[in-house]
Amino acid sequence: MSSILIAVIAISALALVFGLILGFASIKFKVESDPIVDQIDSILPQTQCGQCGYPGCKPYAEAIANGDTINKCPPGGQATIEKLADLMGVDIPSSAHDEEKSIKKIAFIHEDMCIGCTKCIQACPVDAIVGGTKALHTVIEAECTGCDLCVAPCPTDCIEMIPVNTTPDNWKWDLNTIPVVNLPADKPTKASEL
């Protein structure tokens, strides 16, 4: 047998043994988590932006399960608050309605002032900023959650949060408020009778 074949067989055998050990250990030493925390975490948007005051979505989910308020996630918006209220069986906080009326903002980089330091890229939790070292940076509008975390690290203050104008392209229809009426097919009905 050649030495290469022996080495391949030995490494394959070691990989198989270590894989079996890891598989056994993952079953034997599995840590059970709270299922309500997992459900809450699946509702949150997973931007890990920290606007809620927690270092990520999982710690905020744990805090909600322990009784914290459900309206601290700006990227999730009103839809997330409603889903969390339904899951937790609580009323929607009144401040959540005020936050929904606020205008959504996104980051805008004044490229003539940008020095390409990449500090904003490192701060962005959703990778909405593109650019390279010593190159101009720009924000991908569709990806930006408006978390404002990129503004503080910028040494030249070239990033500002600007309001997003509502257009037909970014309009969010609330389909639950559109009335749906079932009409019988055999009886013609006038629109005024609805």
Swiss-Prot record:
One of its GO terms (cellular component) is plasma membrane. Pfam families: Fer4_21, FeS. Keywords: 4Fe-4S, Cell inner membrane, Cell membrane, Electron transport, Iron, Iron-sulfur, Membrane, Metal-binding, Repeat, Translocase, Transport. [4Fe-4S] cluster 3 binds at C124, C144, C147, C150. [4Fe-4S] cluster 1 binds at C49, C52, C57, C73. It is found in: Cell inner membrane. InterPro entries: 4Fe-4S_dom (IPR007202), 4Fe4S_Fe-S-bd (IPR017896), 4Fe4S_Fe_S_CS (IPR017900), Elect_transpt_cplx_RnfB/RsxB (IPR010207), RnfB/RsxB_Proteobac (IPR016463), RnfB_subfamily (IPR050294). Gene3D superfamilies: 3.30.70.20, Electron transport complex subunit B, putative Fe-S cluster. Its EC number is 7.-.-.-. One of its GO terms (biological process) is electron transport chain. Transmembrane segments: none annotated. GO terms for molecular function: 4 iron, 4 sulfur cluster binding; electron transfer activity; metal ion binding. Residues 105-134, 135-164 form the 4Fe-4S ferredoxin-type domain. [4Fe-4S] cluster 2 binds at C114, C117, C120, C154. Its cofactor is [4Fe-4S] cluster. Its main location: membrane. Residues 1-26 are annotated as: Hydrophobic. Residues 32-90 form the 4Fe-4S domain. Binds 3 [4Fe-4S] clusters. Part of a membrane-bound complex that couples electron transfer with translocation of ions across the membrane. Belongs to the 4Fe4S bacterial-type ferredoxin family. RnfB subfamily. The complex is composed of six subunits: RnfA, RnfB, RnfC, RnfD, RnfE and RnfG. This is Ion-translocating oxidoreductase complex subunit B. It comes from Aliivibrio salmonicida (strain LFI1238) (Vibrio salmonicida (strain LFI1238)).
